[in-house]
Amino acid sequence: MSTRLEREVARRRTFAIISHPDAGKTTLTEKLLLFGGAIQMAGAVKARKSGRHATSDWMAMERERGISVTTSVMQFPYGDHMVNLLDTPGHQDFSEDTYRVLTAVDSALVVIDVAKGVEAQTRKLMDVCRLRDTPVMTFINKLDRDGLPPLDVMADIEENLRIECVPLTWPIGMGSDFKGTYNLLKRELHLFSASHHGRIQEGILIRDLDDPLLDEHLGPQADALRMDLALLEEAGTPFSREKYLRGEQTPVFFGSAINNFGVRELLDNFVDLAPAPRPRPAITREVSPHEESFTGVVFKIQANMDKAHRDRMAFMRICSGTFTRGMKLRHHRVGKDVTVANATIFLAQDRSGVEEAFPGDIIGIPNHGTIKIGDTFTESKEELKFTGIPSFSPEHFRRVRLRNPLKAKQLQKGLEQLAEEGAVQLFRPQVNNDYILGAVGVLQFDVIISRLHDEYSVEAAYEPCSIHTARWLHCNDRKVFAEFCDYYSAELAIDAEGALAYLAPNPWRLESAMERYPAVEFRTTREIR
């Protein structure tokens, strides 16, 4: 291993921010970029008068609705480190894309609204983190508003997310009484000072709890802080980086992202504590980031990032070695060598060409329809296939109807390309020519209709269909499986990757099928091929 590769791996930090809608994730993303020097002014998402929009919300529909629909990838330097931040969809209807993003990162940052505590989507996303033992840091946001007591929020996190909480900062007051935070590691006080117009404005440091300045600034809250800290000292759990790296313990930070407060402390601790790129599992072996030979895996496809160019982009996580512009890579699924001359790194929609990139980095490579989610690329000819990138069973279904029959080819192309992105799943029933879309949440259907219109000039509509759920099928007994397929032929469909799925019309029909054919597996997830 070269000394330079070792150094570049050590300075990389690749993570995703996850939260329930409206917990302040997009605002925090903006402020991390602001402190990292990647942008000059935070574009407040809701500040319509200024005409600014959040850097990470670049699709037109996202700007209209104020939600993050796709996953943006942003890279910025911070001190000696290079940070790769994956801003994930915050709306509850966009969680399947978020699930897959969690396969491309080495750690996660969970954002919790202090007034609401743990919410449904956060629980689902933490389940995915737990499957991979992903280290998780927690930022409890909106301390400038009234909310739950800090101990109650942490108890809620421990109970619902099943992870031990250790505060590394502690809030003083809340809402209109919010005075700042105390850093338990550095033993210093950071007084709250609201920012204006997105500019960074630092607080005041007081290092000694016995300093009369503490009482001068906090008044009666000074004694309350001393009591809280004494309680934490006596009853709290000490922070263990080893437990954090194993996904057993989450360090907790408090702040107000919209006011820039607590963000620098969070970022400083993140680059110090979060892991550098880790080994990644493949079918045949584990791949170390320190291996000289390049490997990478595609975890996301985005169509038409620039409408003027009608382009499609494959997002690849570099797993080992060094990427250099113009290098020849083996595309294993199709068995061909490709020369990658124009890879890009993103700041949301702002692209810059890549001369070289290292493990942990996310690069975009142009995709003309040959690259799919889960594809592995290597510098060597070694047969390699990275694992752990799933599809999840949809919860909502719609039948697509075309308003203009002459646009049938455009509809098929649009649906196939959009399904390749992974936001929706496309099913073709075996008994007819219908297009059935399956999604984790209903808002995705609005996105598809909008993008078919804007990007493919196709006017389409939906009809309801009597499908309760989808299950991917597997059976080792060919005779039994053939009998099953014959009996349930009207309820079988092929997905976009050619996998056979059972579209159950109701829970009872699914239960009956499972009882009638116990040798058949009905799977809720499918490894992307």
Swiss-Prot record:
Keyword Transferase attributed: no
| Location of the protein in the cell | Cytoplasm
Q: Which PROSITE patterns does the record cross-reference, listed alphabetically?
A: G_TR_1, G_TR_2
Family matches, as InterPro entries:
EF-G-like_DII (IPR053905), EFG_III/V (IPR035647), G_TR_CS (IPR031157), P-loop_NTPase (IPR027417), PrfC (IPR004548), RF3_C (IPR032090), RF3_dom_3_sf (IPR038467), RF3_GTP-bd (IPR041732)
Matching entries from Gene3D superfamilies are given as: P-loop containing nucleotide triphosphate hydrolases (3.40.50.300), Peptide chain release factor 3, domain III (3.30.70.3280)
* Keywords annotated in UniProt: Cytoplasm, GTP-binding, Nucleotide-binding, Protein biosynthesis
The molecular function terms of the Gene Ontology recorded here are: GTP binding; GTPase activity; translation release factor activity, codon nonspecific; translation release factor activity, codon specific
Query: In its keyword annotation, does this UniProt entry include Protein biosynthesis?
Result: yes
According to the entry, every stretch annotated as the tr-type G domain falls at: 10-278
GO cellular-component terms in the record? cytosol
What GO terms describe the biological role, i.e. biological process, of this protein? regulation of translational termination
Top-rank taxon: Bacteria
What Pfam families is this protein classified in? Answer: EF-G_D2 (PF22042), GTP_EFTU (PF00009), RF3_C (PF16658)
The residues the record assigns to binding GTP are: 19-26, 87-91, 141-144
NCBIfam families to which the protein is assigned, alphabetical:
prfC, PRK00741.1, small_GTP
Q: What family name appears in the similarity comment?
A: Belongs to the TRAFAC class translation factor GTPase superfamily. Classic translation factor GTPase family. PrfC subfamily.
**Physiological role:** Increases the formation of ribosomal termination complexes and stimulates activities of RF-1 and RF-2. It binds guanine nucleotides and has strong preference for UGA stop codons. It may interact directly with the ribosome. The stimulation of RF-1 and RF-2 is significantly reduced by GTP and GDP, but not by GMP.
Q: What is this protein called?
A: Peptide chain release factor 3
Question: Which gene name belongs to this protein?
Answer: prfC
